[in-house]
Each structure stands twice: as structure tokens, then as C-alpha cells.
Amino acid sequence: VGPRSDKKWASGASEKLYKNLKHALEEDSVNLPRLECKYANARVLSCGGTGAQWLAQAPTCHLTQIPDDDMRTVIRFRLGKETFCADVCPHINADGVPCGKQCDREGRHLLSCPSGGGFFVGHDSVCATYCALAAGADGIPGAQAAWKPRVDAWPRSTRGAEADAGFFRLPGSRDTYVDAVCSYANPVTYRGCDSTAGTVAEWKARKKNAEHPVFDAQNHRRLHPFDFRALSFERHGYWAKETVGFTKKLAFARASVLGLDPAAEICRWYGIIS
């Protein structure tokens, strides 16, 4: 698949994916319980947008290559098919205590289990990918990244109060700290995610910004010389608008410095991260 306009592809793919899956969903869900229909609607809405870019790009480069077995699992996951064959959750928390809860075949519990090792692996993998794309050997010339930096402006009152990564010496930008969150759009937990795409991703992004203030809430004056951006994703693929904008900004910076086609570079970043 050749380079495409990032906005045109993302919106077009999202619309087609939503229409096709919703039509199939309506046919399959006639006899489903109401809650199962809500789960299915939330999943379909969460699959589209920029987060679907990987469908058009795997495997156009080594960073988008996916083993066949993993590809099958990913497709099954996004189609709402069974992806987990065990009965009991295998997760163990940081204190060594196993979860032990009963698991559903669709993996819903695994996606939201607070003790999940896979939960943190996925989160850290996304952050590491951003660091590599922006400041790795083939990243933005001159850019630097810091992993889990301490930021005195945001004391660590909870595990997630400080930043996951910091990006420095970005062309035309302030130093920027980011904090990531990968959430499961569960209609039982998040009201409205079965009727509006991106409900969970956008809510989590707002929450991250509230935890990492850069401007005074009363007079809106800048408090710090740096910026903050939330990297907020839904597990089925949807990205918060703020996350899309920051990713596009980084990709455009690299394209500008290296004389690349901005649209193709933005698509490349979307595909690798998604």
C-alpha cells in the first residue's frame, strides 16, 4: 500500500470499518442480550480512526511486521471473537498476589485487570515506541528523550502522577512531557462508550491533563516553561484527539528536517504506533 493522506485514510477506513462491522453486528445481535449488544457497539466504535492505520501498513517495514499468529489474534480481538482459552486470570500483581478471577473468552477481564502484566507491557511498549521514533537512531535529528523522568512540578502522590517520558530539543517546540494510558472501552464502567466513539480515550486524556497542569486553572497563565501531552488510547485502537495531534506534530518535525513527504511520514508513525 502506497503513502496516503493521513486524514483521508484514517477517516475513510474508520467509516468503512464502522459501517461494515455495524451491519454485521446488527445481523448477529438480534438474539443477543442487551449487555452483549452494548459490548459489541463499544468495540466497533473503539476500532476505528487513526488506530486502524496498522491495517493498511502491516508489513510495509520491519517496525510493522507482525507474526502470523499474533496477526490472527489481533484480528479476532477486533472482531470480538474468542481470544483467551484459560478459565482463570493468570495475572500476578506487584506484590506477588495472583488475581485468580474467572475470565471470559473475549478477554474483557484481561484488558482491565489491575494486576495485569500485559497491561503494563502494552503501556510501556507504546511509550518506548514514541521515544524510539522521536529520539532513536533514526529519529528526529537532535531530539532527545528521557524515560520516566522526575518532574518536580508534579509530585508523585500516586503511581501515575509524574511523566512516562520527556521529549527535549524538538524543532519548533517546547520541551514536552507525556503520560500514557491504554484503556478498555467497557460500557459497564464507562457510560456512553457504546454510543460515542472515543468516549474513554478523551475522558482519560482530560484526566491526565488535570493531573499534570501546565496552566493555572483560574487565570490560565502558564505555570511552567514546558508542555504536557496525554497519550491516551483505547485497547481496540481509538486515539484521543490530543494524542493524534502530538503524534502528527512529531512526525511532521522529522519529515521537515529530513526533507520527507509529511503525509507519508505521518502515516508511518500512525501505523507503527497503532
Predicted regions and their residues:
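Class I S-adenosyl-L-methionine
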Residues: 1-26, 132, 169-170, 251-256, ...
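Acidic catalytic cores of enzymes that act on phosphate-bearing nucleotides/polynucleotides
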Residues: 1-81
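Generic alpha-helical structural element
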Residues: 6, 10, 60, 64, ...
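Generic recognition of stable, solvent-exposed alpha-helical segments in well-folded globular domains
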Residues: 12, 16, 84, 121, ...
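Active-site metal-binding core of divalent-cation-utilizing nuclease and nuclease-like domains
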Residues: 64-105, 129-192, 201-206, 210-211
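Short Cys/His-based metal-binding microdomains
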Residues: 94-126
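Catalytic cores of nucleic-acid endonucleases
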Residues: 154, 158-163, 171-176, 180-274
